[in-house]
């Protein structure tokens, strides 16, 4: 999978994109990430990439010309790449969006900055916009990193265990169950006995119920779209009845 990132601050990506799973994916040839400095495509001698907004107002707006020139240079090599914009106006980037994006071969992400970007970038080039949450960031770079990290987990061969992406939190609409490893006891806190029993059916049942408990406690809104069977619904009813007593 190929990512091209259009940004004013390419150095921000050096740590997150050169460590851990992403680094190994790049080394194995499963992932290709290229950074493009938008400022390099400004044509004036001062390399200006922003200007005051028409109509007045606070902040500065990223100019359309440098972004267009940078994007067109990338598209000359990646004509089929899907063009995305990180923006608070975009749809929420979630696990389903990450899975969807992983089906693409080539993706271009434009990182917004300052007060925003000239609207003509959207009108002329952008195919989709994503937000990672209802909060303000200094720029779209952090959002782009989050999107890449979440997406590459669904690229075949990236994770060590093929099933990891399918059992992670949100994979079936629920928060994930608690995890434990050695030692079996630490400062009076023991690993649940069922996890040491060797009974795979009981372990699976415990994990499913804990996932339901975590979800109803922290993110009950997720249950509206979660994939639930009759046992799940019965257990949720028990939890609700217990909470009302």
Curated annotation (Swiss-Prot):
Localisation: Cytoplasm
GO molecular function term, any single one: tRNA (guanine(37)-N1)-methyltransferase activity
Enzyme Commission number(s) from the entry: 2.1.1.228
GO BP term, example: tRNA N1-guanine methylation
InterPro entries per the UniProt record, alphabetical: Alpha/beta_knot_MTases (IPR029028), tRNA_m1G_MeTrfase_C_sf (IPR023148), tRNA_m1G_MeTrfase_TrmD (IPR002649), tRNA_m1G_MTases_N (IPR029026), tRNA_MeTrfase_TRMD/TRM10 (IPR016009)
Family matches, as Pfam families: tRNA_m1G_MT
Keywords: Cytoplasm, Methyltransferase, S-adenosyl-L-methionine, Transferase, tRNA processing
GO cellular-component term (any): cytosol
Binding locations of S-adenosyl-L-methionine: 112, 132-137
Uppermost EC category: transferase
Catalysis performed (reactions): guanosine(37) in tRNA + S-adenosyl-L-methionine = N(1)-methylguanosine(37) in tRNA + S-adenosyl-L-homocysteine + H(+)
Assembly description: Homodimer.
Family: Belongs to the RNA methyltransferase TrmD family.
Described purpose of this protein according to its UniProt entry: Specifically methylates guanosine-37 in various tRNAs.
Name of protein: tRNA (guanine-N(1)-)-methyltransferase
């Amino acid at each position: 999978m190929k990512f091209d990132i259009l940004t004013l601050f390419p150095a921000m990506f050096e740590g997150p994109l050169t460590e851990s799973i992403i680094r190994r994916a790049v080394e194995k040839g499963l992932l290709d990430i290229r950074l493009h400095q938008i400022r390099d495509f400004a044509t004036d001698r001062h390399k200006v990439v922003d200007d005051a907004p028409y109509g007045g107002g606070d902040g500065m707006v990223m100019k359309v010309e440098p972004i267009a020139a940078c994007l067109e240079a990338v598209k000359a090599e990646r004509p089929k790449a899907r063009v995305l914009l990180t923006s608070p106006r975009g749809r929420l980037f979630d696990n389903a969006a990450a899975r969807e994006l992983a089906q693409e071969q080539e993706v271009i992400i434009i990182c917004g900055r300052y007060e925003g970007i000239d609207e003509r970038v959207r009108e002329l080039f952008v195919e989709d916009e994503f937000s990672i949450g209802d909060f303000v960031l200094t720029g779209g770079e952090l959002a782009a990193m989050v999107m890449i990290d979440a997406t590459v987990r669904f690229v075949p061969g990236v994770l060590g265990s093929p099933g990891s992406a399918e059992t992670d939190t949100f994979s079936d609409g629920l928060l994930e169950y608690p995890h434990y490893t050695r030692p079996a006891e630490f400062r009076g806190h023991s690993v649940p006995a069922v996890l040491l029993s060797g009974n795979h059916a009981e372990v699976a049942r415990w994990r499913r119920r804990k996932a339901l408990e975590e979800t109803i406690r922290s993110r009950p809104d997720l249950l509206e779209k979660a994939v639930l069977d009759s046992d799940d619904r019965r257990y949720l009813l028990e939890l609700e009845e217990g909470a009302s007593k």
